[in-house]
Amino acid sequence: MGIVINLFLIIAASIVFFVVGFYIGRFFLERIGTTKVLEAEERAVQVIQEAQKEANDYKELKVNEVNQEWKKRKREFDSEVTIKNNKFAQLQKQIRQKEVTLANQMRDIKETEKKLQEQREELKHQTQNVQNRSAELEKTILEQNQRLESISNLTAEEARQMLIDNMIAKAREEAAETVHQIHEEATQKADRIAEKIMLTAIQRISFEQATESALSVVHIQSDELKGRIIGREGRNIKAFENATGVDIIVDDTPEVVILSCFDPLRREMAKLTLQKLLVDGIIHPVAIEKAYQDAKKEIEDVIMSSGEEAISSLQIPDMPAEIVNLIGKMRFHTVYGQNLLQHSREVAMLAGLMAAELKLDAKQAKRAGLLHDIGLVLPETEMPHALAGMEFLKKFNMSPVVLNAIGAHHGEVEKASPIADLVDAANIVSLSRPGARGAVTAEGNVKRLESLEEIARTFPGVIKTYALQAGREIRVIVEGDNVSDSQADVLAHDIASKIESEAQYPGQIKVTILREKRSVAFAK
């Protein structure tokens, strides 16, 4: 019995402990759950706040990117608008020039019509005189015939012969009048046809007409680069001018450097040299010389490509490489202020179109027109450029028609074919554009500068000569091994004396002798 009671008590105690433990455990579990929920809620709030912050940061970043992209697009748009406005202004300028040209042509046509009207009146007057003379002649012949009939002492043969002579004289008079009328009609018809051909050729081509300038503008990123271009005590500018033969002008104009030279080829090489230096960012005498040599090679490629492009555009086949090179050099020469290559292409187009209208060989006309001024880019010669070009092209087995047209376009040789007349006429039309006459002064100045350089090159030991400062200074580079310092002083005096005796110039000209000696050794 005691055992049963003990078991019962143990079971009851176990139940009590189980119930108490159950509620105690539930209580602690509820406390722990509540704490976890609070922590989860706090974590959720923190995550939401972090997400909102990241979203705001991302939004701000994207807004900045969009703003930057918009500003970039706006700058590109503004730049494009500026370029289009400039092109539009150029087109307007070309249209105004063409309007002036057409107005001049209309004035010439009206003057020609006036002259034709005067010639018609004169022809009418002459026709009336011829008719009057013919009537008088008929009256005289009639009187003589009547006298012959009344004279009985003439034999029949004599009377017959006199009548025949009178009829022959009348026939000759009528024939002369007919020939005169045919000649007048043929002349008028030829003038109309020539005028039509010329106007048709002019209307079918269009070339820009711009006077070449002696200045080139190079844009730089900032004015800070001007100091680097000048160099310490101006040594970079001196090295640049000695290497290129071009004046470099650094003034207060923002982000601009100006190159000045009468020779377009030297000016273009100097421009390319300066652009290479600005891209590399390294500017000193050695870098200048290297950039100049690189630019010189690139210009040679540009010359060949320009010649090939001109030949291709005119569809002229089979041109030797030496001639192609000279045609490319025309791009860097001027005639009456006009680019020589553009002028030659214009003459070739005009001559070719007129030859096609006249059923002549258009390819020969275009070839002669393109090469008619090739003598201007040949080395110095005492012959006129037309004869020099003709003699130079003889070694390439050019057609005699082409050679004659080239040599005769300034009258040095007699024209031997219609092609020569067409090339001469096309050359006159091209040089008669508005503004060509005003460019004669600039062309004369260029010739004067070239003559100054040529005078200095005649002395022994001279390597290069450059006319700078619009001809106010001649810079002469001599061989350091062959010309000493004392000889350089004498050479400067001799050059100045020869310029005084042979050249005409305003003011005074400074002669500067540059003598440089380089010693090179290699460490092995």
Swiss-Prot record:
Residue span, HD domain: 340-432
CDD domains: KH-I_RNaseY (cd22431)
One GO term describing the cellular component: plasma membrane
Entry coiled-coil feature ranges: none
GO biological process, one term: mRNA catabolic process
Superkingdom of this protein's organism: Bacteria
Main location: membrane
Residue intervals of the KH domain: 214-299
Keywords from the UniProt entry: Cell membrane, Endonuclease, Hydrolase, Membrane, Nuclease, RNA-binding, Transmembrane, Transmembrane helix
Alphabetized GO MF terms: RNA binding; RNA endonuclease activity
Location(s), subcellular: Cell membrane
EC number: 3.1.-.-
Pfam families associated with the record: HD, KH_1, RNase_Y_N
Topology within the bilayer: Single-pass membrane protein
PROSITE patterns in the cross-refs: HD, KH_TYPE_1
Tagged with keyword Transit peptide: no
Parts of the chain that traverse the membrane: 2-22
SMART domains reported in the protein's UniProt record: HDc (SM00471), KH (SM00322)
Range of residues in the leader sequence: none
UniProt record similarity statement: Belongs to the RNase Y family.
HAMAP family noted in UniProt: RNase_Y
Role of this protein: Endoribonuclease that initiates mRNA decay.
Protein name: Ribonuclease Y
Organism from which the protein derives: Chlorobaculum tepidum (strain ATCC 49652 / DSM 12025 / NBRC 103806 / TLS)
